[in-house]
């Protein structure tokens, strides 16, 4: 065995060379065609690295590739009061040609993406809501009043207390409706309508 302190011959240098398997151009072409859609460069190395890339490419071919390169467009909308939740869900699935090197995530199927926005949407304005609430037949209120008075006369303390609280909160809401209409202008029909608070015809009995 040659001494380590002496000069190292070329034959001894062969012992320190890492074992790298050379690949012919035809095999490299086959690998590049097989790894279609992958944007990382092919590095000549051991077969373990190539087998890892081959397995990863098969998994990506089975999945659909979704990109994050359009995030920069959404960042421009941030701070302007624009809700980007719906925009994120409606971004089309891009092809592998536009893949970013550092931002790739995969999903199983594109069809399983939620089609609707998760943000709550208002289906009607406050004016139409007030109009709909005030168009409830008076028969409903009369029936409720009769039931409440019967429960008051029966003497159930808990029922009387609950009904009294409910009636007081309803009267408070009716008193606040005109102020809310002036503070928040809505449709002209609601603005022109005179909203008068409904006063109780009988004093509420004490609980």
From Swiss-Prot:
Transmembrane segments: none annotated. It is found in: Virion. It holds the Pfam family Corona_I. Its main location: virion. The keyword DNA-binding does not apply. GO terms for cellular component: virion component. The gene encoding this protein is included within the N gene (alternative ORF). This is Protein I. It comes from Bovine coronavirus (strain LY-138).
């Amino acid at each position: 065995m040659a001494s380590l302190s002496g000069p190292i011959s070329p034959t001894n240098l062969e012992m320190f060379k890492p074992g790298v398997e050379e690949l012919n151009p035809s095999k490299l072409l086959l690998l590049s065609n097989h790894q279609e859609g992958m944007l990382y460069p092919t590095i000549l190395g051991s077969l373990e690295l190539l087998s890892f890339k081959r397995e990863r490419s098969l998994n990506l071919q089975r999945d659909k590739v979704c990109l994050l390169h359009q995030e920069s467009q959404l960042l421009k909308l941030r701070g302007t009061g624009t809700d980007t939740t719906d925009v994120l869900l409606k971004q089309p699935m891009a092809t592998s040609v536009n893949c970013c090197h550092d931002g790739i995530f995969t999903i199983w199927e594109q069809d399983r993406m939620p089609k609707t926005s998760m943000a709550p949407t208002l289906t009607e304005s406050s004016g139409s809501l007030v109009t709909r609430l005030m168009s409830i037949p008076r028969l409903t209120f009369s029936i409720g009043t009769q039931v409440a008075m019967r429960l008051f006369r029966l003497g159930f303390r808990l029922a009387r207390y609950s009904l009294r609280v409910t009636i007081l909160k309803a009267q408070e809401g009716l008193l606040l409706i005109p102020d809310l209409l002036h503070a928040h202008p809505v449709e002209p029909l609601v603005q022109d309508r005179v909203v008068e608070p409904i006063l109780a015809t009988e004093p509420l009995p004490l609980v």
